[in-house]
């Protein structure tokens, strides 16, 4: 087995060397998921459309090569490995800072056994066949397969991680190695742009130049950075003043907070989250320093959550609306919204989505999600009617796009009001699960690049939300123990 370096230049993108023999054809794939929300996260937050699977996409990659078996055709530094000799001669501050962590992670990587190799071959075959092992050609498209693989990898690595504590070294290594394999497909997604080129005779010609697609070039490095920040956040919870006790397993010594924080945390949580471990703090509560550190980490992680959510919403917004979704829309928008909401939206007075939401008195996020589905369906129903009523030639449509006549169309006005209502609803419930349209877009999407970005941002969004919720648990227990509530 070859020697492992202590520090490498590329650990910021989550790459670690495998000392074992490598077969470039040996990969693995995720288990076949079902499009339903998973419930391994904290509280009632669901942003994934694949159930937890025991499988993951495992592979071993040579340190001196690119993420794929052949050299990457792009000059994209984020997705390409660099020379290790240079990094060893000129170690960076990042290398020195994470030297000990890297050494521990490398020591955890063992040679792949024969059963593991066979499992990897089987899973990779399943990935290539679009999750259809029968070979009958009924598998899903590549985009959906990769999206499911990322979702299932997240569930495998983080599904049992329900505490504020560092990931085990093997889990962290698996996550970084397998994500690099799944993300390496983006090395080969390009767009062509015109570029002027001067010839030797002085003439100027226009040629097409390839470059990484704009959405991947912008969003993928950002997601990698968010991923790294979340791993650092978990690693920071090594020596803490709080600890955990599983519900129902509290001993007499650990029940010193049962009369205060233990029961109140149960009340604060959803009843269906009974399996989550209970955070415990000293009788006098956390120290001021520990409390400030927790609040600071909560704020930074919350910003990561917002960034991942913004990227995910942007990618979903760029996906085409599937014809299958449009075919299921009712003929009337009123049938989707219901009589009460429709009367308020068609009233002659000034429409206020905030007042409408106050009148509806939504008591749960489940009700909010149902309302979002109905409002979104009515919005596209009215938009479709507005297009049919204002069908014109292409030139006239461009000329009169924002005309007063079109603005006064009833369907157009109702569609705008439905859009504003949906926007306010999502603002009031920022952790709302994905709507039926979002899930349909993911299921019908055939763009591999968008599938990678959407699934990667979605799982990071879920992880960030969980960390924030776990920190809130600890702060709530601390507040209760100090007698502030």
From Swiss-Prot:
Guanine-nucleotide exchange factor (GEF) that acts as an activator of Rop (Rho of plants) GTPases by promoting the exchange of GDP for GTP. Expressed in the vascular tissues of roots, leaves, sepals, petals and siliques. Interacts with ARC10/ROP11. It holds the Pfam family PRONE. The gene is ROPGEF2. The keyword DNA damage does not apply. It comes from Arabidopsis thaliana (Mouse-ear cress). Residues 107-485 form the PRONE domain. This is Rop guanine nucleotide exchange factor 2. Keywords: Guanine-nucleotide releasing factor. GO terms for molecular function: guanyl-nucleotide exchange factor activity. Residues 1-36 are annotated as: Disordered. The PRONE (plant-specific Rop nucleotide exchanger) domain is responsible for the GEF activity. The keyword Transferase does not apply. It comes from the Eukaryota. Gene3D superfamilies: PRONE domain, subdomain 1 (1.20.58.2010). PANTHER family: ROP GUANINE NUCLEOTIDE EXCHANGE FACTOR 1 (PTHR33101), ROP GUANINE NUCLEOTIDE EXCHANGE FACTOR 2-RELATED (PTHR33101:SF47).
């Amino acid at each position: 087995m070859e020697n492992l370096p202590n520090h490498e230049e590329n650990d910021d993108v989550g790459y670690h060397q495998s000392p074992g023999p490598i077969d470039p054809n040996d990969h693995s794939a995720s288990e076949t998921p079902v499009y339903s929300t998973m419930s391994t996260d904290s509280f009632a937050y669901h942003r994934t459309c694949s159930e937890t699977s025991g499988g993951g996409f495992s592979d071993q990659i040579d340190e001196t090569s690119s993420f794929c078996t052949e050299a990457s055709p792009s000059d994209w530094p984020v997705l390409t490995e660099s020379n290790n000799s240079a990094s060893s001669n000129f170690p960076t501050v990042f290398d020195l800072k994470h030297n000990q962590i890297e050494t521990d992670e490398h020591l955890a990587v063992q040679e792949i056994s024969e059963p593991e190799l066979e499992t990897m071959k089987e899973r990779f075959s399943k990935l290539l066949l679009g999750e259809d092992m029968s070979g009958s050609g009924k598998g899903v498209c590549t985009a959906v397969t990769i999206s499911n693989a990322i979702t299932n990898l997240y569930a495998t690595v983080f599904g049992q991680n329900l505490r504020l504590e560092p990931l085990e070294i093997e889990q962290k290594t698996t996550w970084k190695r397998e994500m690099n394999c799944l993300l390496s497909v983006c090395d080969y997604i390009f767009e062509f742009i015109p570029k002027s080129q001067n010839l030797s005779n002085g003439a100027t010609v226009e040629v097409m130049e390839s470059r990484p697609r704009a959405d991947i070039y912008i969003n993928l490095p950002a997601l990698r950075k968010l991923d790294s920040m979340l791993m650092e956040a978990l690693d920071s919870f090594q020596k803490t003043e709080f600890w955990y006790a599983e519900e129902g397993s509290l001993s007499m010594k650990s029940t010193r907070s049962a009369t205060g924080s233990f029961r109140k945390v149960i009340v604060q949580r959803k009843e269906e989250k009974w399996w989550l471990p209970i955070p415990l703090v000293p009788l006098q509560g956390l120290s001021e320093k520990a409390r400030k550190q927790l609040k600071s980490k909560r704020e930074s992680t919350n910003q990561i959550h917002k960034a991942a959510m913004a990227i995910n919403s942007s990618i979903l917004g760029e996906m085409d609306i599937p014809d299958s979704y449009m075919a299921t829309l009712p003929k009337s928008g009123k049938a989707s919204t219901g009589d009460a909401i429709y009367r308020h939206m068609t009233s002659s007075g000034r429409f206020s989505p905030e007042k409408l939401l106050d009148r509806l008195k939504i008591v749960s996020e489940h009700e909010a999600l149902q309302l979002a589905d109905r409002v979104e369906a009515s919005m596209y129903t009215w938009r479709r009617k507005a297009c049919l009523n204002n069908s014109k030639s292409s030139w006239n449509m461009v000329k009169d796009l924002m005309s007063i006549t079109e603005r006064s169309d009833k369907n157009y006005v109702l569609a705008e009001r439905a859009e504003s209502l949906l926007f306010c609803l999502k603002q009031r419930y920022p952790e709302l699960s994905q709507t039926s349209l979002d899930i349909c877009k993911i299921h019908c999407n055939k763009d591999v690049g968008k599938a990678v970005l959407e699934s990667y941002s979605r799982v990071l969004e879920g992880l960030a939300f969980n960390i924030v919720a776990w920190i809130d648990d600890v702060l709530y227990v601390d507040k209760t123990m100090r007698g502030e509530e």
